[in-house]
Amino acid sequence: DENNFHHAKYSRSDPGARIGYLTLETGVQPFSQAWNDALSLAGKTLYGAGVRVIVLLYGSYFGTDLFGSGRLDEIGGLKRGYSRGIPGMESLLALLRSKDYQQCPKDLGLSPPYANDKATKTWLDQHAKDLGNFTADYERGLREGFSSSDSTPIACVRHLWSSLNHHLGRMEGAFTLFHDISTLKQQFNLNETHRVLILAHGHAGQLAALLSNLLAQEESSVRDELFETTAHHYGQFDPPRPAIAHLQGVDQFLAANQQATFPALDIVTLGTSVRYGWNTNGIGKLLHMINHRPIRSDGKKWLAKMDLPQIVMEMPTVLGGDYVQQLAVASTDAVLSTPLEEELNQALQENLE
C-alpha cells in the first residue's frame, strides 16, 4: 500500500489473516549435512522464484544506545526511580546507566558509526559472535547451501550499517543500502526479472522501511521535501558527508524512472521495532518475524507482549520474548554528536514521526 513516509501505527486491532503464529522446533544443526540438504532444496525454490542475491543486513549493539537512554539521562530519567512498580524494569535499566551499557569495554573501543568493511565485520565476529550478528561463517554457510547445485547459484553478501540509531543515521543508512544494491545489480547483471532478498535484523529493518518509501512508484511531495531538506543541510557540513553522493544516486534513479529495470526487493525483518511505515508499492514481498510468547487467556494472541528479564543475567537469553523489539520504538533514539546533526535530525523527524 501507499505509505508516503508516515509513521507506522501502533494498533490493537486484529490483523486477521495477515499474521501467523509458529512454534519454534529444534531442527538440524547448522552447517551439518542435513542443514546443507535443506538449504539446497530452499535454494532451488528461491532461484526458481528469481532470487539471485541475498543481502544480510545488520548492525551491532556494541557501543550503541538501543533504548535512547542518553536522552533519559538528559532529563534525569534514569536517576528518578521511574521504574518503580514495573517488574523487571530495574534489571533492564541496570545496563543503561552511564558508562556501562552505552559503551564498549575500554580495551575494545569500537563504536558506531560502523564501517561496512572486512576489518569491522571481523572484529564483530570475534567479539559478538552470533549474538545479533551475521557472521562470516553464517554467510558462507548460506551461500554454499543455497548454491550447492551449480545450476542455481545465489550470491550471499553481508551489509553492516552504521548502527547510528536516529533518523539521520537510518536515512543515510537507507541511501547507502540502495547504493550497494545498485552495485550488486551491476555486478551480477540483474534486471527486472530478478529478485534480491534482504534479511534485516533488528534496527537494520528500519533502513529497509525507509527504502520502501524512497523507491515508491507514485509521486511524493514528502519525499521531495526530505531530499531538499537533507541536501540543504548537507551543504553546511565541512567536510561534506559521504552520504550526499548516495542521496544524489537515489534522486537520479527516480528522475530517470529506472524502477522498470530494477530487480524486485523482497524483505524479511527479524525483530524490527514498529517505527517507520512500509510502502509496499516500492518493494516486492514483505514478511516480519518477531520472537514473542503469544500466551493470553482472552485468545487475543496478537496483543501478546514480551516478559522483561527479571535479572541482568537473563537479558542475553531473551527467554521472555524480544524486549528490544518491544521497547525500541519512537522516542528511543540515540543522542547525536553535533548541533548541526541534531538540527538535520529534527528536520527529518518532522516528516518521519
Show which residues each predicted segment covers.
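Acidic-enriched, low-complexity/disordered segments with a strong bias for Aspartate over Glutamate
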Residues: D1, D14, D37, D65, ...
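Serine-dependent carboxylesterase/thioesterase catalytic core
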Residues: D1, H167, M171-M315
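Aromatic-residue detector
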Residues: D1, L24-T26, Y82-K99, P112-A115, ...
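Terminal low-complexity/disordered tails
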Residues: D1-K44, Q252-L254, M315-E353
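Active-site catalytic motif of lipid deacylating hydrolases and related acyltransferases
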Residues: Y21, R52-T193
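Residue-identity detector for threonine
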Residues: T23-T26, T45, T64, T120-T122, ...
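Amphipathic alpha-helical oligomerization segments
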Residues: Y47-G50
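C-terminal catalytic-base region of ester-bond hydrolases, centering on the histidine
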Residues: V55-L57, F67, M89-L92, K99-L110, ...
